[in-house]
């Protein structure tokens, strides 16, 4: 993207009102007690785009997990939960529970504050987070009514977890076993494991090729269960941005979700002027960029978009 285009986007966003032009906009998040954060650490979201930067272990992902739990039907405990090896401190010396407070603008443009606490659910789940009435201990006015959790579509793309269909099988096997996969990963085993997996991929890639070339739409497996979804053709706008980000000129591309290699996963196909290739011959940054651009250009308006570990893959 040219500097002029970036500047134009920033100018447009600066002219927009966070309270009027963005539905249920999260304007601030505060952490009375959260992980190893300093008490009442606060982040203001005074611009629609926020980039969290810092060394490893400074809490960037932890902030994303909290924001993920802000809208209704989403829960921070899906990503941060207690185990025998990594227990979570229930409360600090002042009896303040693990918590965060986020501020947002309601439909009338009025800023509201909502407290979220990590509590024991009715079903006995200790990793459940629930909104709470305002409590003085958490810096809120108890006389104020409890707002409802914001109703907002959310998309969380954590690129640490995005693995292509090819990489899932080649590095972890059909059942995700690691015993031989680790040896393969570090070059300690180049015989049977390599040969078995290459033979399997060569055989099953014929099915993938048939779908990518449009010869077949859906391939059924045992009991007539579909082994893939319909291939998605990337739009001209998607191809433009993928080319811009990666610095190559692509003419077309496809995304397909399938289980030809044993487990469900995504494959991509990118075509340049004289050749095309799948994620098997693409870098992890190419694969991640295709999914990122496709998802961002197809989300609903006023969605909360959280991106984790993006720069690591685009370096």
Feature-to-residue mapping (PLM):
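Glycine-rich, often proline-containing surface loops adjacent to acidic residues and nearby aromatics
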Residues: 25, 46, 301-309
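P-loop NTPase switch/coupling surface
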Residues: 1-193
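Short, flexible loop segments at the rims of nucleotide/cofactor-binding pockets, characterized by
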Residues: 29-30, 281-283
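GG-anchored amphipathic helix commonly corresponding to the ABC/SMC/Rad50 NBD signature/C-loop
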Residues: 67-70, 267-276, 282-307
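Extended helical coiled-coil dimerization/tether regions that scaffold
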Residues: 2-18, 161-281
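A short catalytic or substrate-binding loop motif that flags glycine-/basic-rich loops and adjacent residues
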Residues: 91-96, 259-262, 284
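Catalytic acidic motif of RecA-like/P-loop NTPases
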Residues: 50, 310-314
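Secondary-structure boundary elements
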Residues: 22, 244, 248-249, 297-304, ...
